Amino acid sequence: ELFVVEWLRRHAPSRYAVRGQDKVEFRMGHVVSINIDITVEDLETGQTAFVLDTKYKAAEQPAASDIEQVVAYAEAKGCTQAALVYPVELGRPVSGMWGADIYVRSLAFGLGGNLEEAGRNLLEQLQLWGETGA
């Protein structure tokens, strides 16, 4: 997670601020906090452009609970773009709408080969996805 955060911080366009462990608090009789692995803020709009949840284990496909988690993160930040980031390409990746307004997809930041290339591929997917709306 920290590696992905640092890589994105160093290579993302200057229009974006990348944050790791972005804490969001809710008051529900008492304070409930969640920590979002990675948020990417669009500095031109002041809005959260993406929420990313990093995963450490390879899987055939994302677990339903992981999708629900990243959707909750997106809702908490008022964000319409959410991604699960895995260390390898998934056999059955996801890409689609959750409800009417949150686009969820699984992406890879491959850790087994050229890390610069893997990072550029992730950044390209985020740029294309964010700049063109999917």
Residue ranges: model-predicted function:
Residues E1-A134:
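Catalytic core segments in nucleotide and nucleic-acid processing enzymes
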